[in-house]
Amino acid sequence: MEINGVEIEDTFAEAFEAKMARVLITAASHKWAMIAVKEATGFGTSVIMCPAEAGIDCGYVPPEETPDGRPGVTIMIGHNDEDELKEQLLDRIGQCVMTAPTASAFDAMPEAEKEDEDRVGYKLSFFGDGYQEEDELDGRKVWKIPVVEGEFIVEDSFGITTGVAGGNFYIMAESQPAGLQAAEAAVDAIKGVEGAYAPFPGGIVASASKVGSKQYDFLPASTNDAYCPTVEDNELPEGVKCVYEIVINGLNEEAVKEAMRVGIEAACQQPGVVKISAGNFGGKLGQYEIHLHDLF
């Protein structure tokens, strides 16, 4: 299969079940919502060494669609362990959103997806030291926590669902600039898919990994040498000088598949892309096999 002359390898991405939360962060302006978002999604690329996998889902939610009538941004936070995810929700909303000027936090999990919930707002309300108040806003139970700025408003409970983590594809290009241009185009396309996010820096992985190590038994992961252009015995097609990986997490398999589809299509429209592939473990580890050819 080819798209715009770019080979699409007959392979699949192996993805996993993961617990997901979805948070709407609003503020007095989109600028301040984004500042809170960047803090709340920080150090959230991969659970290989990060405490969660976090990123932006919807980069702009207009005031008419938010509970408090202010501009907002929707983020997603994922972890393979539900208790760890609940802890991350508490930590990230408490330390990164409550501390951000004018920011508020609301549950953004669709009711149809919600499997469980955690009373993050209730837990955070104790920061108010007895001065906190329970209230209702736009039909939602919220807590008003007094802070030196005024009040921090946070929804009482946040929904949790079983989503999908680790959807992926590789962009193999004839040069680093060409690869980066294609990867940026892919991420821009993925931003338009609701319920999916790319947790790595700018949505792009520059140092794709493999499980374990050939040389060091203490490593949980090491460089994917088969795709490293500077390694002499790599497995790259002729002419490939750079590889970027795009990793996608989502609320469900459909969102991840759609994000992969539009991302691959966008990448293939850019010059200098040689091949699109994907990472898997032979179907031995993940619950999902997303075959590239089936996306089109």
Swiss-Prot record:
Q: Which GO terms describe its cellular component?
A: cytoplasm
The chemistry this enzyme catalyses reads: N-formylmethanofuran + 5,6,7,8-tetrahydromethanopterin + H(+) = N(5)-formyl-5,6,7,8-tetrahydromethanopterin + methanofuran
What is the primary gene name for this protein? Answer: ftr
Q: Name one GO molecular function term.
A: formylmethanofuran-tetrahydromethanopterin N-formyltransferase activity
Task: Specify the protein name.
Answer: Formylmethanofuran--tetrahydromethanopterin formyltransferase
What NCBIfam families does the database record attribute to this sequence? one_C_fhcD, PRK02114.1
Keyword Lipid biosynthesis listed: no
User: What family does the database annotate?
Assistant: Belongs to the FTR family.
Q: Which organism is it from?
A: Methanopyrus kandleri (strain AV19 / DSM 6324 / JCM 9639 / NBRC 100938)
InterPro entries the UniProt entry points to: ForMFR_H4MPT_ForTrfase, ForMFR_H4MPT_ForTrfase_C, ForMFR_H4MPT_ForTrfase_fd-like, ForMFR_H4MPT_ForTrfase_N
